[in-house]
Amino acid sequence: MGTIPTKIAIDAMGGDYAPSEIVEGAIKAQEAYGVKVLLAGDPQQIKASMNHRLSQPLPEIVPAEDIVEMHEEPLMAVRRKPKASINIAMKLVKDKQADAVVSAGNSGAAMASALLRLGRIPGIDRPAIGAVLPTMIPKKPVLILDVGANVDCRPKYLDQFAVMGTIYSESVLATDEPKVGLLNIGEEPSKGNDLAVRTYQILQENNQIKFIGNAEGRDVLSGKFDVIVCDGFAGNILLKFAEAVGDAVLQMMREELTPGLSGKIGTAILRPNLKNMKQRIDHVEHGGGLLLGVGGICIISHGSSKAQSISNAVRSAKEAVENRVLERINSKYLLEVENQ
């Protein structure tokens, strides 16, 4: 008998291009990564998006009667709509019918649904969204967390983010002794606001991580750090700025290389290099951020995600499941809870 494929539940109705692009991405992922995809959403709309596809088997459809819209207040909508697609997808993980969830819908709703249905890992005060960014060193990405789950943080939250980030970096990114940094406005321990100064002291005393000091904005993509922690307010701004810079660089390259015969010749010569560069800096390649600290694997993708981004998000979910990220965080904090 073959190995049982990883099962990924996808919120098929979440996102600006749902369900068509979500379905397309699910099919791509199922073909590319050998996973089994379960699509939670309106069966009629999902089937309509599958009509042109001949590949077999197609993802399984799990009916959901409602949708949490992007403009809705997340917690209220999640509670008021128990049969919304995001809730059905989360329930599949809770009931162990799926191993992970991917959603490009209302990110606040995804977090609220995860907390209500999957709960927090014992010992974790707040979950965090971790995003992987490329650095100037090939194949040496940096994990930033939190990038949006918690606008306001306490030092102990960032300390927990550092531990969870270290586990993820070791498990999924195959980093040996991840070097942890604290996002700040200077290198000195005394620099920054009250949160930064107090967090620095706590991280320095944490023997579960390899804390090497403050990370300034210029250090983020340098390759010096493997994990950088910050509050969700600063992290979200950092993430979106980095993605915008990546988009701008790609657009500038297209504009400079396309005009005239010389541009076409240059493009042809540089095509392999340009393709590699695009794969490194295009945020679509990373698919989404992992919600760390909840009792299940949950990937939160951009609302603007299209098929390729969804497919890559499924890949990220599969990697987190197969590298037992949840179990490793659980075991780390279970020991702490028992020793308290």
UniProtKB/Swiss-Prot annotation:
Gene3D superfamilies the UniProt entry points to: Isopropylmalate Dehydrogenase
EC number: 2.3.1.274
Alphabetical keyword list: Cytoplasm, Lipid biosynthesis, Lipid metabolism, Phospholipid biosynthesis, Phospholipid metabolism, Transferase
Pfam families assigned to the protein according to its UniProt record, in alphabetical order: FA_synthesis
GO annotation terms (biological process): fatty acid biosynthetic process; phospholipid biosynthetic process
Catalyzed reactions: a fatty acyl-[ACP] + phosphate = an acyl phosphate + holo-[ACP]
Keyword Transferase: yes
GO molecular function: phosphate:acyl-[acyl carrier protein] acyltransferase activity
GO cellular component entries: cytoplasm
Pathway assigned to this chain's UniProt record: Lipid metabolism; phospholipid metabolism
Keyword ATP-binding applies: no
Record's subunit section: Homodimer. Probably interacts with PlsY.
Record function comment: Catalyzes the reversible formation of acyl-phosphate (acyl-PO(4)) from acyl-[acyl-carrier-protein] (acyl-ACP). This enzyme utilizes acyl-ACP as fatty acyl donor, but not acyl-CoA.
Family to which this protein belongs: Belongs to the PlsX family.
Name of this protein: Phosphate acyltransferase
Organism expressing this protein natively: Trichodesmium erythraeum (strain IMS101)
